[in-house]
Regions:
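Plant-biased recognition of short, low-complexity, intrinsically disordered N-terminal tails
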Residues: 1-8, 177-183
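N-terminal helical submodule of small eukaryotic multi-pass membrane proteins
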Residues: 2-86
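Juxtamembrane loop-transmembrane helix junctions in multi-pass integral membrane proteins
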Residues: 4-11, 69-72, 102-106, 138-145
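Helix-to-loop junction signature of class
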Residues: 27-38, 121-133
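Signature of small four-pass
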Residues: 78-115
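Alpha-helical transmembrane segments of multi-pass integral membrane proteins
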Residues: 122-183
């Protein structure tokens, strides 16, 4: 029997989750870092504020604009991102990048399922909020690219990831159930 190779979609997941991991660390979660690391121009991570300001000015993203405070639901989603998505993303990147010839393991598939569900939920909520925002919050010329180019892909791809991982896990669970019934 020929050795199994990593599925092409796993390389796509690695690419997407790596981008998300970078976005979490460089944009989304900066406010959780100690202010001494980023607040002052001489701080070692001050470049992250410059990066965030560039991102906001380029995209018009109202969720990260300095002049609009976060809604409470968004603050909770950032906490979930820090406590759940970040560790899952780091684990998945390490697992998906580990070997070009190794298919995913059960634990990696379970982590992918959890990551996909949580990420889909957060991004879908942002998409819904963005969809309903008026021009007083986000300009019409920025809204479409922001919704369809930035947030929607990070809802759709994790949803596909969650379905894919659940379909991979299902035979493992069924096989385990079959073994348990024969014992």
């Amino acid at each position: 029997m020929a050795p199994q190779r990593k599925a092409l979609r796993d390389w796509l997941y690695l690419f997407i989750i790596s981008i998300q991991l970078f976005g979490m660390l460089a944009l989304d979660l900066v406010s959780f870092y100690p202010k001494a690391l980023y607040a002052h121009p001489s701080s070692p991570l001050h470049f992250l504020l410059t990066l965030r300001n560039f991102y906001v000015s380029s995209t018009g993203d109202p969720f990260f604009a300095q002049d609009s405070p976060h809604q409470p639901w968004f603050d909770i989603f950032l906490c979930i991102e820090a406590l759940v998505q970040l560790p899952l993303a780091a684990y998945l990147v390490s697992q998906l990048a580990s070997s070009s010839n190794k298919p995913t393991s059960g634990p990696a598939e379970l982590a992918g399922l959890a990551f996909g569900c949580v990420t889909f939920m957060g991004a879908a909520a942002c998409c819904a909020e963005l969809w309903h925002m008026g021009e007083d919050v986000v300009s019409a010329d920025k809204k479409g690219p922001l919704l369809y180019g930035t947030y929607l892909p990070f809802a759709v791809i994790p949803a596909v990831l969650a379905v894919d991982m659940s379909l991979r896990l299902l035979p493992r669970v069924q096989q385990s159930d079959a073994k348990a019934k024969t014992q």
